[in-house]
Amino acid sequence: ISSSYVGNQVRTLFREKSAAGKKPSEIAKEVNEVLFNELSEFRFYCTAQIVQIFFDTDTILFLSAGHPEAIINRDSCRDIKLTGNQSPVIGLFNDENYREEIIRLSTGDSLLLYTDGIIEEHSSDNQEMYGVNRLIDSLNGTENFSSSEILHHALGNLYEFNGYRPQNDDITLICIKKT
């Protein structure tokens, strides 16, 4: 079975479960059961970050399964921190428990989601990895930036670190900012 076929099936599962109004933990648990029960012999698994935004309450339900913790940039107190919740990858083990986190965003706050390809990127001399601390440091002073400006600033910092070399891994960066 090709991974692209499985990827399409997993995407469809996520969409179906999301459209049914389920919470991120329920979505992850149900997709995990399907992957484990139907594809465990092939050892297929996936990582995911599931985000549900509730504009009426300024809250986000967030689940990270096998991805690095997201970064919350609090504008009001100039505080940048990691979310405190990580769940296992989806599809490898039966009967996993997944937990979402409730994040409340105030005006000016942002949530940064990223893949491990960013923090595992190597310096131009291959002596060190970028790491989560450098990513967090790249967000200092971006409180008044738009989400697009935050992304450009963070990626510019990363590319400067790696000497603008071609990437070896996927690099995905998403910024959700409350305006």
Give the predicted meaning of each segment.
Residues 43-45, 91-97, 156:
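Short gly/ser/thr-rich secondary-structure transition/capping motifs
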